[in-house]
Regions:
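Outer membrane beta-barrel translocator domains of Type V secretion systems
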Residues: 305-506, 628-632, 636-652
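Blade-level signature of beta-propeller repeat domains, shared across WD40, Kelch, NHL, RCC1
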Residues: 241-274
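Structural motif
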Residues: 32-38, 82-87, 125-131, 183-195, ...
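Repeated scaffold domains used in trafficking and secretory/extracellular systems
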Residues: 57-66, 101-113, 147-167, 214-220, ...
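Outer membrane beta-barrel transmembrane domains
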Residues: 419, 537-652
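A short beta-strand motif characteristic of beta-propeller blades
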Residues: 47-55, 92-99, 139-152, 201-213, ...
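Conserved beta-propeller blade signature
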Residues: 25-29, 73-76, 117-121, 171, ...
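Solvent-exposed, glycine/polar-rich loop segments of beta-barrel outer-membrane systems
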Residues: 392-401, 430-440, 469-490, 521-545, ...
Length: 652
């Protein structure tokens, strides 16, 4: 302990120089049973007033403080020495053990953050410590007395306020300050209990200086994490209680303002910022507001979650990031990831439809018609699609690796017209947020396609249905709290599209400007997470409609190499998403300790404008078999996706 006291003494001047926080929320007791909340910068305006329930009839609350090890739980002591744990939002009090002391008044009540014990001092010079988990008396310490060498050595202390510095969980150093009212006969005195060489457990007081304010025994006193010291003093004549800032170096008190009404106030606790106020976005604030609604006194995983957020206070942005992890933001990319199979289908089907429009050279060197090329055709391709969606606002970075196989069968019933069917399977591994384990999507899909042309003009069209089977995993880790919720859900995608353009041939060189449109209707079913402890969510159904235009051109060249025809094609285009509204995800915590009221999360959409580029290599001989290899990329600042495919087609 001596090293801790030396550290505390050396840092005193620094702590005392910190100005009061103008937006700090503070709480005090009036009428003995009502918890009043005000803003430290405007103490005359009551933010909330809550009746404390659950305390024994005829008793009153005299001292309050937040426990550093569980900083959202307000602890209190009554005039008969009973310790209570209170939910400050609801006012519901839970008795902790049995009374630790007989009748007491003029109470100083504060937590020692280094040992997680409650210090209680009184105007009758009592000085004792209480175990917060049981309410039991830990030990009676020495009678409060000024040090023999102190300027006030002969004074009889009337201590009615106590506060420790550095009130954070796991603190390794702290200093105990007390306020001596001097029986309201002179301005109150600020003192330390103990110093660098004397333990506070001896009850020895050392004068810091006069507050300059005379007060009766209704005193409140607390020190914030950043060293701001606040006190409530009550004028002996007017009985008006006012809020003051206190200089821990000189003892001088500076008036901030009168507390509301003409009632007496007793006790003071500086509350932490609300979780909602920690959010940097509306979605984070919504998550925080739900956590602010926690019920009862947090215990177990609920306490670990809440304490984990609070422990991040010293790192800018860390609390907002924790709220993001607790949101359904990791699931906001599910509709886009669910379109993997559709993207693969569209790319391959439209490419094959183009091949159907006369890519076989006859023996005399002329281009074959559909009918010349064979009335029945089949194709089979396999490949992979991989990439990521970038992080933006409330959307975390999501990566995925997909493999697929699909094939089709078509019938050419006119020289310029063909129809066909296709189907396939897609398997996707996805990380929904950085650090999370892999989620898996299995998709079965099938559809129809067709092509028709008149002269250089053509129209290709397709439609498909995709069944979705998701095994979901996300990871949560912050401030000592961690969880890995999992879930299973399904869904489906209806999609259809068409492409039209003009195809020109210039002696082996081909140019094809085109325009395409695709509509997709995605549904990901509602689900409830498992294994998420206090952070598990119920997530509502997600629906998304997409109407996308694609405008671009293809340039190709084909040449005879030995007995084979080799075709090389390059393409580029611009995508425009016309239905880009931000979807709402309705979600709720499963943990009743956090409240299960649904709240809305507004997903951050991907940019509506992006680009694509690709290339195809095709090789065919005089027989029915042709081989193709294709690469396609979609990109902008929000996404980077590549698709690689190899396959074969057969004409009969």
């Amino acid at each position: 302990m001596r090293g801790q006291w030396l550290f505390a003494a050396a840092s005193c001047a620094l702590i005392s120089s910190v100005p009061p926080a103008t937006a700090q929320t503070v709480q005090s007791i009036t009428d003995g049973t009502t918890l009043v909340t005000v803003n430290a910068s405007a103490p005359g305006t009551v933010l909330s007033s809550v009746a404390i329930s659950g305390i024994a009839a005829g008793t009153t609350i005299g001292g309050i403080d937040y426990r550093p090890a569980s900083p959202r739980t307000l602890y209190a002591i009554s005039n008969v020495g009973q310790v209570y744990a209170i939910n400050a939002r609801t006012g519901v009090a839970t008795a902790v053990g049995t009374p630790a002391s007989p009748t007491i008044s003029g109470i100083g009540f504060d937590f020692n953050p280094t040992v997680d014990r409650i210090r209680v001092v009184t105007q009758t010079r009592q000085d004792f410590r209480v175990v917060p988990d049981t309410g039991a008396l830990a030990v009676f310490d020495g009678t409060l007395t000024y040090a023999a060498t102190d300027p006030r050595a002969t004074a009889i202390p009337n201590v009615a306020g106590a506060a420790y510095t550095n009130p954070v969980a796991g603190a390794t150093s702290t200093t105990l300050y007390v306020i001596d009212t001097n029986g309201a006969l002179a301005p109150a005195t600020l003192a330390t209990q103990g110093n660098a060489t004397v333990s506070p457990n001896t009850g020895t007081l050392f004068t810091v200086g006069s507050t300059g304010v005379t007060t009766i025994g209704n005193v409140g006193f607390d020190i914030s994490r950043n060293g701001t010291a606040l006190a409530t003093f009550t004028d002996p004549t007017t009985r008006q209680t006012s809020l003051y800032s206190v200089n821990l170096t000189t003892g001088a008190a500076t008036l901030i303002g009168k507390l509301a009404g003409s009632k007496l106030y007793e006790g003071l606790a500086i509350a932490l910022d609300s979780f909602a106020s920690m959010g940097a976005t509306a979605n984070q604030a919504a998550v925080g507001a739900q956590i602010d609604m926690f019920t009862g006194v947090p215990t177990g995983d609920t306490a670990r979650l809440i304490n984990g957020i609070d422990s991040l206070y010293a790192t800018p942005g860390a609390q907002a990031a924790a709220l993001s992890q607790l949101s359904p933001g990791a699931y906001s990319s599910l509709p886009d990831l669910s379109l993997n199979a559709v993207e693969v289908s569209e790319t391959n089907v439209l490419r094959y439809a183009r091949d159907l429009r006369g890519q076989k050279t006859m023996a005399d060197g002329t281009t074959a018609t559909l009918d010349d090329a064979g009335r029945v055709g089949a194709w089979l391709v396999g490949g992979a699609r991989f990439g990521h969606f970038s992080a933006d606002v409330d959307r975390p970075r999501a990566t995925s690796d997909e493999v697929h196989v699909l094939g089709g069968l078509d019938f050419r019933f006119a020289p310029a017209t063909a129809i066909g069917v296709f189907g396939g399977y897609s398997d996707t591994d996805a990380r929904l947020s950085p650090g999370s384990q892999q989620s898996k999507l299995k998709s079965l899909f099938g559809g129809v396609y067709g092509t028709a042309s008149v002269g250089p003009a053509y129209v290709d069209a397709w439609g498909s249905y995709t069944d979705l089977d998701w095994d979901l995993t996300r990871s949560i880790a912050f401030g000592g709290f961690s969880a890995q919720p999992t879930a299973h859900t399904g869904g489906r995608v209806w999609a259809a599209g068409a492409s039209t353009g003009l195809s020109f041939d210039f002696g082996g060189f081909g140019i094809e400007p085109y325009a395409a449109v695709r509509y997709a209707n995605v549904r990901v079913d509602a689900f409830g997470e498992q294994g998420g402890s206090a952070a598990a969510l119920n997530v509502g159904q997600q629906k998304r409609e997409s109407l996308r235009g694609n405008f671009g051109a293809r340039i190709g060249y084909e040449a005879k190499v030995s007995s084979a025809l080799v075709r090389i094609e390059g393409r580029g285009g611009y995508y425009r998403e016309f239905m880009n509204d931000r979807e709402l995800i309705t979600t709720s915590f499963q943990n009743a300790g956090l409240g299960t009221t649904p709240f809305a999360f507004q997903a951050t959409r991907l940019d509506r404008d992006y680009y694509n580029a690709g290339a195809t290599l095709g090789v065919s001989g005089n027989g029915p078999l042709s081989i193709i290899a294709d690469y396609d990329a979609q990109f902008d600042h929000d996404r980077r996706y590549s698709t690689m495919t190899v396959g074969a087609r057969f004409a009969f």
